[in-house]
Amino acid sequence: MSSDTSSSRPPQPDSGTASKSESENPAIPSPKPKAHAPLTNRDWWPDQVDVSSLHPHSPLSNPLGDDFDYAAEFAKLDVEALKADMISLMTTSQDWWPADYGHYGGLFIRMSWHAAGTYRIHDGRGGAGQGMQRFAPLNSWPDNASLDKARRLLWPIKKKYGNKISWADLITYAGNVALESMGFKTFGFGFGREDVWEPEEILWGEEEEWLGTDKRYSGERELAQPYGATTMGLIYVNPEGPEGKPDPIAAAIDIRETFGRMAMNDEETAALIVGGHSFGKTHGAGDADLVGPEPEAAPIEQQGLGWKSSYGTGSGKDAITSGLEVVWTPTPTKWDNSFLETLYGYEWELTKSPAGAWQFTAKDGAGAGTIPDPFGGAGRAPTMLVTDISLRESPIYADITRRWLDHPEELADAFAKAWYKLLHRDMGPISRYLGPWVAEPQLWQDPVPAVDHELVDDNDVAALKKKVLDSGLSIPQLVKTAWSAAASYRNTDKRGGANGGRLRLQPQRSWEVNEPSELDKVLPVLEKIQQDFNASASGGKKISLADLIVLAGSAAVEKAAKDAGYEISVHFAPGRTDASQESTDVESFAVLEPRADGFRNYIRPGEKAPLEQLLIERAYLLGVTGPEMTVLVGGLRALGANHGSSKHGVFTDRPGALTNDFFVNLLDMGTEWKASETAENVYEGRDRASGALKWTATANDLVFGSNSVLRGLVEVYAQDDAHGKFVEDFVAAWVKVMNSDRFDLK
């Protein structure tokens, strides 16, 4: 049925409740930060770099200890018994939080979706991989109202199976089981998410109040990076429309932007909304002012539960979560095509929920009584969210959803794959997945081939190192190439890294930070060494270019250490393979391109953020600590590994030798630093007595002398007895970065 003007863009009334999200976000009062006198160093000096951000999840906070092996514990788990217990849980309604329609499936789908849906592509943060929904701020986000009850319902399962199943896996798996228990065939499931035990500081937005939007947009509604959501405290978008204005077309624009930032294309986006909204309901039975504070602000006697409502019984038929009161289909506990049949089967008019939230109801009383009440009351009229109507009104989504209306099997396939991607997007390569239900590799998992040949041995490694060092390539060239390959790694979502050899492929081959013109000189030489070895090696031995790039860089580090008077062997573990261009999603990889890399003293033209802050961010994404960051920067400067062979920060008269000169000369009080009058982002270090120019630097360099924490680390490596320690620590940090994506070694 084609839509008429009643379901096109409605008039723009004042927002009833602007505090909503996709699909259950509260109209209830949201938390606001309480003002207080400065209590921390960060309060006093907010512009100082926060080195402590490089040390999240201290092992001191982990009650399971350093020796705990989750994969080994999981191997003891009877996954079929777990699944059976969870299916039983789905249909065992509890008096303290009754199940809609006698089935918790809709609630658990929302819990899993909101755990995974925090993932964002621009920095890889968020996602379900660590069970962060248990902690602030996520446990108290307006969008996560009532999910405290969902997690509490899971406690008997967690209690029974103990350390064999993590909270992170259990929270995520619950939604998968919910779908299967209601007749949907999922694409698979991978376990393997390890719990953390304390929250992590993540910049979710700069707004000073939850549900704000004023600090994340500029220009014509341009959403700042790296944010994924339109609104502070929401997972995706406001289901009443942008800022609570019920405009389905404008909402579709927000949907496309925010789901795209979660790595979903248009079809995946539509599939997730249609599939997710085929089950359950939203909750807005009464006045939202009767709902109490979120878990982090709730009274101690509520024991971690929040949003206690005094409206009626406060639960069941009286539940208030989002302020929206929508049941999407006549079969809310069964998979079928009734969401689209309902969406296209009626014309829609704008109405308000009992809590005053904007939603749509079938026009002129059509369909009255066809939607079942969750607790046996009178039948209801069909209802939809503003963002549901977007799927019909937006030409982009209408083309997709109208096709699925006639071909429900295509919807089922698209939803199964999009749901699998949603739950696993932050887990990295498939080698990290556990359990019997892991699906075949997908392009978005950045697949690499399995090793199908004998690996090089110690004698081969020694011979290859000699060939590399005799090739005419310089130490800086070899070091920079290896760093370019490995430093694409993001510890947040476990993407990038040297494995796969994608430095030779697009888009990484063309990234400015990787100096394409230099790669054009280095890679052909290494490829020739690889080809010659593979053609002549006996016993089926081969070396991948991915392995050789790392080996060549490590050989250069050994040579540089020797030139500085220190003999050391850099550990090398073969086993990387070379991916193909066909198995590399160019658009997906593009978001890994660094806006800055302080380790190479690189900044993208036009970047305005402080360099020292970007250095900390790059170190965080690499997963290195403050001491590791310090020793790596000092060592890479000594090796001459700057982007474009810049001399900034190369505080040595013997570049290419692995010395601690960077630290010694940075602390030299005979040097006075001033901002350059001719070059942006550059500082000049001049002799205090003569005024002669000695060095140039950027904030990436000088922060190590300016910041008190970093200066303390620099002092360790600048001491007269520190050269040996410096080399050993640099090599250890180097190997860590080179092996960041070698999950087979961990």
Curated annotation (Swiss-Prot):
Annotated crosslink Tryptophyl-tyrosyl-methioninium (Tyr-Met) (with W-113) location:
236-262
Highest taxon, organism lineage: Bacteria
Q: Which spans does this entry mark as compositional bias, Polar residues?
A: 1-20
GO terms assigned for molecular function: catalase activity; heme binding; metal ion binding
Give the cofactor binding note. Answer: Binds 1 heme b (iron(II)-protoporphyrin IX) group per dimer.
Show the InterPro entries listed in the entry: Catalase_peroxidase, Haem_peroxidase, Haem_peroxidase_sf, Peroxidases_AS, Peroxidases_heam-ligand_BS
Show which residues form the site (Transition state stabilizer): 110
User: What is its EC class?
Assistant: oxidoreductase
The keyword Protein biosynthesis is assigned to this record:
no
Q: Which residues bind heme b?
A: 277
Q: Which cofactor does it need?
A: heme b
Q: Which residues form a coiled coil?
A: none
> Sorted alphabetically, which Gene3D superfamilies does this protein's record hold?
1.10.520.10, Peroxidase, domain 2
GO BP term (any one): cellular response to hydrogen peroxide
- Which catalysed reactions does the entry list for this protein? H2O2 + AH2 = A + 2 H2O; 2 H2O2 = O2 + 2 H2O
Q: Which family does the entry's similarity section mention? A: Belongs to the peroxidase family. Peroxidase/catalase subfamily.
Q: What is this protein called?
A: Catalase-peroxidase
